[in-house]
């Protein structure tokens, strides 16, 4: 497979590193959250931005729940702020962590919020009542990332003790626990066909695991530094990895062949760590954000 990469534009406005991205209120919008404590929404058509809200601490994670018109915002002080997007009113603060909230995920199937904390805790709350349902101390390191596999009713959790943990989504029983990386496991992502679990670590490796027995299929030395995010294209044919080594890499999702390296030299990419990526269905744009305070929009097309 051959692809071409075109940079559409760079969006600027945040005053500090950007740590969080999520889909916006419509296909052509995205949300961003930054060290400047501001949530903004960006229009991928006009490239204009709107300030949505500001918060008392650095923003590390966001989760848009369109079904409820809510935006969940995780901050460096361990709080999750619940924002009503209709009136931009902050309606609740969930205080279940004592350190950064690195990831927030919502499951429509369970109607629960799942959070990964820098305090080593993995917490689950009801979205209806915001009550804490369960909290697990997984390790003495940071819990970094969460993903769901609804076909097998499993939750994968990555943490700083190098471990990947697999939980039953209904009972929260731990089903598997295995060393995912030589250094911190930063990101977990089930493939769209849910046959594989992809993980990225501080060791720069992209690891592919067989769902079920979670035996390793492939270990790729993908980056020179930590991998922070993994995103699949809307058609599932491509996947992208984002790294502290300042690059985004595009891979064939079936063969895991490296197709392109997006960097500063070749594509006027990021100056510093690339912290977050999301692949939009709007024009098939790949969106990236990093420590350079920039959001970049990329068009990735087969040749």
PLM region descriptions:
Residues 11-18, 53-60, 95-101, 136-143, ...:
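WD40/WD-repeat beta-propeller blade N-cap
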Residues 33-36, 74-77, 116-119, 157-161, ...:
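Conserved strand-to-loop turn within each blade of WD40 beta-propeller repeats
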Residues 25-26, 66-67, 108-109, 150-151, ...:
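Residue-level detector of Asp-centered blade-edge/turn motifs that repeat once per structural unit
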Residues 39-42, 80-83, 122-125, 164-167, ...:
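WD40-repeat beta-propellers
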Residues 44-46, 85-88, 127-130, 169-172, ...:
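Short loop/turn segments that connect beta-strands within beta-propeller blades
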Residues 273-303:
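Blade-level signature of beta-propeller repeat domains, shared across WD40, Kelch, NHL, RCC1
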